[in-house]
Amino acid sequence: MQENKQPSEIQGELPQPPDGESVPPQPTNEQAPPDTDTMPRIEETLRQLELKAAEHHDAWLRARAETENVRRRAQEDIAKASKFAAEKFAAAMLPVKDSLEAALTIEKQTLESLREGVELTLKQLNAAFQNGGLTEEDPAGQKFDPNKHQAISAIEAEGEPNTVLNVLQKGYLLHGRVIRPAMVMVSKAKGT
């Protein structure tokens, strides 16, 4: 009769082969025989992942093409904006040109009517400038600013040095940016 062995002792013992025979190794979890259902499942999973990868690649290509189209359209818009930036201003200049041409067609003008015509044309021109964001810089009596003024000469004068005494030619700003500095005469301290 066999002795009653403890479960821990039973687990550690392997069955012994009869004398002279060898026992083939028992499969363990690491050496499990291939499951016949596993390969088709792996192939199906691989096929699904390949489809998803193809979808993602296609979406990436579409996004890349769309980005390129947006970039190209933006460049075209910038080129058009640059090309036609002066369109509004040019349209505002046309009535001024028309007025000047009309004045030249009148053969017998009085000095007074010519003056009135020039004043009206100047008003049209000033309105066009104002609508286009072009403003005059007339700095008489102001402190000299080298960013907005160009000093033609300096004259000894009473008062604060570097003050604009006389404006020889007005300056112009386009939306606050100097496009032509005012040509000015400035004061300097006596004896310098």
From Swiss-Prot:
GO terms for cellular component: cytosol. Keywords: Chaperone, Cytoplasm, Stress response. It comes from the Bacteria. Pfam families: GrpE. InterPro entries: GrpE, GrpE_coiled_coil, GrpE_head. Residues 1-43 are annotated as: Disordered. One of its GO terms (biological process) is protein folding. GO terms for molecular function: adenyl-nucleotide exchange factor activity; protein homodimerization activity; protein-folding chaperone binding; unfolded protein binding. PROSITE patterns: GRPE. It is found in: Cytoplasm. Homodimer. Participates actively in the response to hyperosmotic and heat shock by preventing the aggregation of stress-denatured proteins, in association with DnaK and GrpE. It is the nucleotide exchange factor for DnaK and may function as a thermosensor. Unfolded proteins bind initially to DnaJ; upon interaction with the DnaJ-bound protein, DnaK hydrolyzes its bound ATP, resulting in the formation of a stable complex. GrpE releases ADP from DnaK; ATP binding to DnaK triggers the release of the substrate protein, thus completing the reaction cycle. Belongs to the GrpE family. This is Protein GrpE. It comes from Aromatoleum aromaticum (strain DSM 19018 / LMG 30748 / EbN1) (Azoarcus sp. (strain EbN1)). The lineage of its organism: Bacteria, Pseudomonadati, Pseudomonadota, Betaproteobacteria, Rhodocyclales. The gene is grpE.
